C-alpha cells in the first residue's frame, strides 16, 4: 500500500513539474507567438479595440478610427475607400489586415518600440492611448487621375518619384470598399468577403503588387 502511495505521489510530482515547466516556457519564451496568435481573444479585443492612428494623404485622413458602442470601442472607417483601397488595404477582426494597415500595424496600433516613451507618457498623464498617424507620400491628385484612367478596366498604375523612390500614386482596378470588411459584425464581414472573393473580376487582388501580372508601360 505504501509503495502504491509513493508511486502515486511520484507521478503527481512529475505531472506538477511538467506543468510548471510548460507554464514557465510559455510565460518567458512563447509570449510573442501567443500575443500574435489571431485566435487569442484578448489580443483580438486589445488590437481591434484600440484607438488606431490615421492614415493620411495630403493632410486628409483616408483611414481613421471613430468611437463605437460595442465591445471593440473603436470602428475603423475609410473615406474615399475605393480610391485608396490598393494603398490602405483593410483592417478586419475576421480576416486580419492588408496594405498599409498591415505593413505599418505596429505604428498605427501604438505598439512599436519607437513609441515606448509615448505609451509611458500616456500612462502617467492619464490620457487615452492612441496609435501614431502614418502620412503617405501619395499625391491625391495623381491618385485620382490613376483611378480615372483605370475606370472600367482591369489593371494597375503605380507612379514613383525616380529620385527618392516615393510612391506618388498606386491604384488597382477593379477596386472595392474596405469598409465592408471593417464591420464589427462577423457574419456581415464573412458574407461581404465571400461576395468579393467570388467576384470573377477579383477586386481583392491588388494588381499593383501582385507580381508580374502586367508589363510596365
Language-model segments: residues:
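Extracytoplasmic/periplasmic proteins that interact with beta-lactams or build/remodel peptidoglycan
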Residues: 1-156, 171-209
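Surface-exposed patches in mature extracellular/periplasmic domains of secreted proteins
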Residues: 156-162
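Active-site-proximal helix/loop microenvironment
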Residues: 209-217
Amino acid at each position: 500500500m505504501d509503495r502504491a502511495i509513493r508511486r502515486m505521489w511520484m507521478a503527481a510530482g512529475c505531472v506538477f513539474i511538467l506543468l510548471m515547466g510548460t507554464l514557465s516556457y510559455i510565460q518567458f519564451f512563447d509570449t510573442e507567438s501567443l500575443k500574435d496568435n489571431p485566435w487569442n481573444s484578448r489580443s483580438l479585443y486589445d488590437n481591434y479595440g484600440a484607438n488606431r492612428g490615421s492614415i493620411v494623404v495630403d493632410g486628409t485622413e483616408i483611414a481613421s478610427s471613430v468611437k463605437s458602442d460595442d465591445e471593440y470601442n473603436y470602428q475603423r472607417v475609410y473615406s474615399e475607400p475605393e480610391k485608396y483601397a490598393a494603398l490602405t488595404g483593410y483592417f478586419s477582426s475576421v480576416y486580419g489586415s492588408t496594405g498599409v494597415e498591415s505593413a505599418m500595424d505596429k505604428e498605427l496600433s501604438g505598439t512599436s518600440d519607437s513609441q515606448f516613451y509615448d505609451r509611458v507618457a500616456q500612462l502617467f498623464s492619464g490620457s487615452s492611448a492612441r496609435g501614431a498617424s502614418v502620412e503617405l507620400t501619395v499625391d491625391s491628385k495623381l491618385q485620382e487621375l490613376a483611378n480615372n484612367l483605370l475606370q472600367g478596366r482591369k489593371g494597375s498604375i503605380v507612379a514613383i518619384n525616380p529620385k527618392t523612390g516615393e510612391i506618388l500614386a498606386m491604384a488597382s482596378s477593379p477596386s472595392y470598399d474596405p469598409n465592408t470588411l471593417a464591420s464589427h459584425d462577423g457574419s456581415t464581414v464573412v458574407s461581404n468577403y465571400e461576395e468579393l472573393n467570388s467576384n470573377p473580376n477579383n477586386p481583392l487582388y491588388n494588381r499593383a503588387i501582385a507580381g508580374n501580372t502586367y508589363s510596365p508601360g
